[in-house]
């Protein structure tokens, strides 16, 4: 009797975000979230977002480049097709949120809180994620 080959799971294919038709935002993310339930199709660049605390908001088809998030809490928020590039998300809280097709590229994620957060098709490339809380 020949020994059987061990079962090997095929690699999981992670789907990248679909980022299309984005406009450069003239307002901060906080200004958008103060007036909108859903923020979509925007590119945010080089700014600081401080002391934001929002719940039950949606962010769709957005890119964040060189953004520093300081003392921010985004509870039960939904992120779909979002890319963070060269951002500092240290100690930000995404508690009870869902992240679907989200990329973190060259980001600082030290102490980022993701308790009870749903992570689907999420990638982290060249990130510092020490003390990340899942």
Model-derived features: positions:
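Tandem repeat scaffolds
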Residues: 4-8, 13-134
